[in-house]
Amino acid sequence: MKIVLASNNPGKLAELQALLAPLGLELLSQAELGIPEAEEPFRTFVENALAKARHASRLSGLSALADDAGLCVDAFGGLPGVDTAFYATRFGYAKGDNNNVRALLEQMAHLTQPGQRRAALVSTLVAVRSADDPEPLIASGRVAGEIALQPVGSNGFGFDPVMFIPEFAQTFAQLPVSVKNANSHRGKATAQMIALLRERWL
């Protein structure tokens, strides 16, 4: 079964291809099909993921899977949230993972006490059989941790180098990819999605 991933992010595509491999699904990126990115006008992950999935399905004629994910920092009232990908641009930097990390560390520099750097990575996955599917599959994963004082590790992407996970006493970027994938927000959401796909679509 072919499913289009409503994302142009190569890191996200590689991670989801690995996580969905047990189902034998062929996951194509929307970029391969010449599909432009969808608008993301909403303030919640689930609404944006649904909009992206419907957009990719409408333009490809295929079933679609979309992920909307982000970092929610307690000290910032849950922000940057749905604006995570563009976080650095709020502070004069170009869009990009390294600049997002730099901007976050600068904005959190004054927060040095235990508990002040709490944050969560959240992922919401939505799958639709068609653009007008009235019953989308929805899965959500969340991992709580703390923002490290500086980036550590070279695996992963996004905020992985500064997302310190107390249960492992390491950042996501320090963990082997297989361990990170099994325990990440996207890994948890994907496990739920796999169960839903098996139950309802396959």
Curated annotation (Swiss-Prot):
Reaction(s) this enzyme catalyzes, per UniProt: XTP + H2O = XMP + diphosphate + H(+); dITP + H2O = dIMP + diphosphate + H(+); ITP + H2O = IMP + diphosphate + H(+)
Superkingdom of origin organism: Bacteria
Any one Gene Ontology molecular-function term assigned to this protein's record: metal ion binding
Protein known as: dITP/XTP pyrophosphatase
Function text: Pyrophosphatase that catalyzes the hydrolysis of nucleoside triphosphates to their monophosphate derivatives, with a high preference for the non-canonical purine nucleotides XTP (xanthosine triphosphate), dITP (deoxyinosine triphosphate) and ITP. Seems to function as a house-cleaning enzyme that removes non-canonical purine nucleotides from the nucleotide pool, thus preventing their incorporation into DNA/RNA and avoiding chromosomal lesions.
Keyword Magnesium: yes
Cofactor: Mg(2+)
Cofactor: how bound: Binds 1 Mg(2+) ion per subunit.
CDD domains for this protein: HAM1
InterPro entries found in the cross-reference section: dITP/XTP_pyrophosphatase (IPR020922), ITPase-like_fam (IPR029001), RdgB/HAM1 (IPR002637)
Active site (catalytic residues): D68
Family statement: Belongs to the HAM1 NTPase family.
Residues reported in the UniProt entry to bind Mg(2+): E39, D68
GO biological process: nucleotide metabolic process; purine nucleoside triphosphate catabolic process
Keyword Chloroplast (UniProt): no
Oligomer and partners: Homodimer.
EC number in record: 3.6.1.66
A Pfam entry, by short name: Ham1p_like
Species name: Polaromonas naphthalenivorans (strain CJ2)
